[in-house]
Amino acid sequence: MTRKTLAIEGLTATTVIDGQQRVLVDNLSLGVQRGRILALVGASGSGKSMTCSAALGVLPPGVTASRGRVTIDGVPYAANALRGRHVATIMQNPRGAFNPVRTMRDHAIETLQALGKLSSNPQDQIVHCMRAAGLEDVKTILSLHPFEMSGGMLQRMMIALALLSEAPFLFADEPTTDLDLVVQLRVLELLEKLVEERDLGILLVTHDMGVVARLAHDVAVLDHGRLIEQAPVMDIFQTPGHEVTRMLVSAHLSLYGMELNA
C-alpha cells in the first residue's frame, strides 16, 4: 500500500545581516510519510526549526522563503492551506504558546473556530482529543489556566489541540524540551501511539539523539541549512556517512561511556 507523503521540495530561506544575504535553509528537500516519524537533527542554528517555519509560511520578520514548495502526493499546497488542515504543529515551549488569561476550554474553542470546525456542541470532540492525548480529568483541565498546569500537562494539551485539526501530518518542534525524563518518556510514548493508531506522519525536530533513537524511523541531518545525510535510524547510528552525523552520534554515545565503531 502506498502511503500518503508530504514532500518539501527545494526549500530556501534567506535573511540579510549587515547588508549581506545569508542563507538559513539551502535548497532543502525531504519527505514525510504517514505512519512514520522523520527526525530532523543537527547542531543549534543548523536550520531545523527554520525549515518547519518556512514550509508552513510562518517565518520571523526579516526572513524570506525565496523558493521551494510543499506537496502532498505530488499536489502543491500554499502554506496557508497546509497549516492546521493538513499539518498540525506542536512547539517546544508550550507554556509560551498559550494565552495566560484564557482557560483550556477557551483555547480549544478558539482552535476549532480557526479551523472552521466549531459545531453547536463541540464538547464531545474536545473531550475525545484530550483523552487521546492522555488527559483524563477533562472537566477540571478545561477550566484551568496555563499557569495552573505542569509542563507535561501543557504539552499534552497542545497535542490535543493539534488532534482537533484531524490533520494527517504533525510538525513537532523539540516536543520534550524542558520536560523531566519521566514526562519526556510519556510524551514520546504518546506520539508513538498516535502514529500507530491515527497513521500520523511526524516531522520531529530535535537535538536529542536519545529521542531520535527511541522514536524515529528515519533521520535527516542538517548542517548550516543544508541536508547532508538522510537514512533509516539504524543506519544513522551504526554507519553514519557524514562527519557531522558522526559527531552527533559520537557525542550521544559518549554520554553512556560508549564509542562509535570506526
From Swiss-Prot:
Which Gene3D superfamilies does the record cross-reference, listed alphabetically? P-loop containing nucleotide triphosphate hydrolases
The recorded induction information for this protein reads:
Induced by low oxygen tension and metal ion deficiency. Repressed by NiCl(2) excess.
- What Gene Ontology cellular-component terms does the record carry? plasma membrane
Location within or outside the cell: Cell inner membrane
Q: Which GO terms describe its molecular function?
A: ABC-type nickel transporter activity; ATP binding; ATP hydrolysis activity; nickel cation binding
Q: What is its EC number?
A: 7.2.2.11
Tell me the superkingdom of the source.
Answer: Bacteria
Identify the SUPFAM superfamilies for this entry: P-loop containing nucleoside triphosphate hydrolases
Pfam families found in the cross-reference section: ABC_tran
Q: Where does ATP bind?
A: G42, A43, S44, G45, S46, G47, K48, S49
Q: How does it sit in the membrane?
A: Peripheral membrane protein
SMART domains according to UniProt: AAA
Which keywords belong to this entry? ATP-binding, Cell inner membrane, Cell membrane, Ion transport, Membrane, Nickel, Nickel transport, Nucleotide-binding, Translocase, Transport
**The keyword Nucleotide-binding appears for this protein:** yes
Reaction(s) catalysed by this chain, per the record, are: Ni(2+)(out) + ATP + H2O = Ni(2+)(in) + ADP + phosphate + H(+)
Q: What class of enzyme is it?
A: translocase
Q: Which residues form the ABC transporter domain?
A: 6-249
The record's listing under InterPro entries reads: AAA+_ATPase, ABC_Ni/Peptide_Import, ABC_transporter-like_ATP-bd, ABC_transporter-like_CS, Nickel_NikD, P-loop_NTPase
Q: Which family does it belong to?
A: Belongs to the ABC transporter superfamily. Nickel importer (TC 3.A.1.5.3) family.
SUBUNIT field: The complex is composed of two ATP-binding proteins (NikD and NikE), two transmembrane proteins (NikB and NikC) and a solute-binding protein (NikA).
Q: Report the function annotation for this chain.
A: Part of the ABC transporter complex NikABCDE involved in nickel import. Responsible for energy coupling to the transport system.
The name this protein goes by in its record: Nickel import ATP-binding protein NikD
Q: Which organism is it from?
A: Brucella suis biovar 1 (strain 1330)
Gene symbol here is nikD
